[in-house]
C-alpha cells in the first residue's frame, strides 16, 4: 500500500511539473509573439504608464523603473521606423509590379493588334507588316474641329494648309487650283484674322485654333519657315480625331486630286526633294579614302530628304509620335523643321537613342513634282514635257514662288507652251 501511495504521489508530482513546464513554455511563446501584450501598442503604452504610476504610488519602482520606460519607448520608435521603411518598400515594389504589368499589357495589345503568331512561309513568299493599325478616334480632344472635319472630310481624309497674311497671294493661287480640280476636302488653318476673312470671301473651309500664345505669335508674324514649323503641333489633333491628313504648304499648285494617287500602306507618305531616280529613291554611294589601302572604299546608303511641305500621315501611333518628336525638338532649338523631320524618320536606334519605328514611302517624283524636277529636267525634255502631267507642283526650290506658280497654271491648265521658258534653272 505504501508503495502504491508513493508512486501515486510521484505521478501527481510529475503531472504538476509537466503542467508548470507547459505553462512556462506557453508563456515564453506568448512573450515572443506578443511582446507588448495581447492588445494594441497604444493600449500597452497606456497600461504601462498606468502601471508605472501605480508602482510609484506603492513604492515598487524596482519593477517599472524610468530606465525601463525609456527603453520601451526607444524600442517603440525603432519598430515604428522599421515599419515605415517596410511600407515604403512595399509601395516601391507595388509600383514596379504595376509598371511591369503595364508593359506586359502593352505588348499583349500590340500582339492582338498585329494578329496571332504565324509560321514563316516558303522562301520568297514572306512579307513583313508595314501598315500599322489606326488609332481609336477621340472626339473629346477638340469637339469643334471634329464637327468641321465631319462635314468636309471624304473617307476620313483631308488636305490641310496653314497660312497667315504673309502668304496671301500664294494661298489664293492654291485655292483656285483646288477648286479647279474639284477637291472638296480641303481645310485652311487660319493663323490670323486676315486669312479667316479671305476664306469666308472665297467660300473655303477654315479652322481657327483657340488662343495659344506660343502658336499665335509665330502664326501671325512668322515667315514661311517659321509657319511651316507650326504644323507639327497643329496636325496632332487631326490624327487624334482619326483622320488621315495630307499636309500642304501654300507654294503648291494642285493639278489632279492627290487622294487618287496615294498608296496608304505606310505611316508616312512624302514627296521627295530628289530630282532623279537615285536621289529620290535612294542609292549606294561609295566613299573613297585612298589612305586606307585595301579598305579604301566604304559603301554608304544615301537618299535625298523627304519634303516636309507635302506629306500624308495615317492616324497611327508612329505618326503621332513623329509629330511629337519634331515639335519637341523645334521648341528647344532654332533648327529647320525639314531637317528634324528627316532625322527622326531615318536615324536608326543606337546607344542613348531609340529611333522612331514608322513605316515610310516616297511619292512618285513625276506625279508629286518639285520645282527642280520641273525646271531643270521636265521642261527641257520634249517627251516628258508632253506626256507627264503631275498631280501637284511644289515650288520649293525657288524663291520667286508666286511667279513660278502662276507659270505652272499657264502651262498645265491654260496650255501656254512657253510659260516656263523664261525662268532660270535655279535662282538668280
From Swiss-Prot:
The chain crosses the membrane at residues 16-36. Pfam families: Nucleotid_trans (PF03407). Its main location: Golgi. Residues 37-428 are lumenal. GO terms for cellular component: endosome; Golgi apparatus; Golgi medial cisterna; Golgi membrane; trans-Golgi network. It is found in: Golgi apparatus membrane. InterPro entries: Nucl-diP-sugar_transferase, Nucleotide-diphossugar_trans, RRA1/2/3. Residues 1-15 are cytoplasmic. Glycans are attached at residues 40, 277. Keywords: Cell wall biogenesis/degradation, Glycoprotein, Glycosyltransferase, Golgi apparatus, Membrane, Signal-anchor, Transferase, Transmembrane, Transmembrane helix. It is a single-pass type II membrane protein. One of its GO terms (biological process) is cell wall organization. Its EC number is 2.4.2.-. GO terms for molecular function: glycosyltransferase activity. It is an enzyme of class 2 (transferase). Plays a role in the arabinosylation of cell wall components. Involved in the arabinosylation of extensin proteins in root hair cells. Extensins are structural glycoproteins present in cell walls and its arabinosylation is important for root hair cell development and root hair tip growth. Belongs to the glycosyltransferase 77 family. The conserved DXD motif is involved in enzyme activity. This is Arabinosyltransferase RRA3. The lineage of its organism: Eukaryota, Viridiplantae, Streptophyta, Embryophyta, Tracheophyta.
Amino acid at each position: 500500500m505504501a508503495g502504491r501511495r508513493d508512486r501515486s504521489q510521484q505521478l501527481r508530482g510529475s503531472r504538476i511539473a509537466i503542467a508548470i513546464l507547459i505553462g512556462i513554455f506557453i508563456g515564453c511563446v506568448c512573450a515572443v509573439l506578443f511582446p507588448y501584450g495581447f492588445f494594441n501598442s497604444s493600449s500597452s503604452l497606456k497600461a504601462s504608464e498606468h502601471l508605472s504610476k501605480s508602482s510609484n504610488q506603492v513604492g515598487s519602482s524596482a519593477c517599472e523603473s524610468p530606465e525601463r520606460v525609456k527603453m520601451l519607448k526607444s524600442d517603440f520608435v525603432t519598430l515604428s521606423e522599421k515599419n515605415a521603411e517596410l511600407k515604403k518598400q512595399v509601395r516601391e515594389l507595388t509600383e514596379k509590379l504595376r509598371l511591369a504589368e503595364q508593359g506586359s499589357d502593352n505588348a499583349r495589345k500590340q500582339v492582338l493588334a498585329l494578329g496571332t503568331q504565324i509560321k514563316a512561309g516558303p522562301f520568297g513568299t514572306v512579307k513583313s507588316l508595314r501598315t500599322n493599325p489606326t488609332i481609336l478616334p477621340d472626339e473629346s480632344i477638340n469637339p469643334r474641329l471634329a464637327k468641321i472635319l465631319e462635314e468636309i472630310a471624304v473617307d476620313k481624309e483631308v488636305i490641310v494648309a496653314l497660312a497667315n497674311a504673309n502668304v496671301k497671294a500664294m494661298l489664293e493661287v492654291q485655292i483656285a487650283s483646288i477648286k479647279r480640280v474639284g477637291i472638296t476636302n480641303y481645310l485652311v488653318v487660319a493663323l490670323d484674322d486676315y486669312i479667316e476673312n479671305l476664306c469666308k470671301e472665297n467660300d473655303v473651309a477654315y479652322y481657327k485654333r483657340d488662343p495659344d500664345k506660343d502658336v499665335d505669335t509665330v502664326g501671325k508674324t512668322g515667315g514661311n519657315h517659321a509657319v511651316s514649323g507650326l504644323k507639327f503641333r497643329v496636325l496632332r489633333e487631326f490624327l487624334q480625331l482619326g483622320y488621315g491628313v495630307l499636309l500642304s504648304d501654300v507654294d503648291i499648285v494642285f493639278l489632279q486630286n492627290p487622294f487618287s494617287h496615294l498608296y496608304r500602306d505606310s505611316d508616312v507618305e512624302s514627296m521627295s526633294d530628289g530630282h532623279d531616280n537615285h536621289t529620290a529613291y535612294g542609292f549606294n554611294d561609295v566613299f573613297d579614302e585612298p589612305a586606307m589601302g585595301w579598305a579604301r572604299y566604304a559603301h554608304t546608303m544615301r537618299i535625298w530628304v523627304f519634303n516636309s511641305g507635302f506629306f500624308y500621315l495615317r492616324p497611327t501611333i508612329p505618326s503621332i509620335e513623329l509629330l511629337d518628336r519634331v515639335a519637341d525638338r523645334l521648341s528647344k532649338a532654332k533648327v529647320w523643321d525639314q531637317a528634324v523631320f528627316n532625322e527622326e524618320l531615318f536615324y536608326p536606334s543606337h546607344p542613348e537613342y531609340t529611333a522612331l519605328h514608322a513605316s515610310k514611302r516616297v511619292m512618285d517624283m513625276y506625279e508629286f513634282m518639285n520645282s527642280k524636277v520641273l525646271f531643270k529636267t521636265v521642261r527641257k525634255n520634249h517627251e516628258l514635257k508632253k506626256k507627264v502631267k503631275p498631280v501637284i507642283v511644289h515650288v520649293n526650290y525657288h524663291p520667286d514662288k508666286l511667279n513660278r506658280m502662276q507659270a505652272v497654271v499657264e502651262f498645265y491648265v491654260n496650255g501656254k507652251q512657253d510659260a516656263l521658258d523664261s525662268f532660270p534653272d535655279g535662282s538668280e
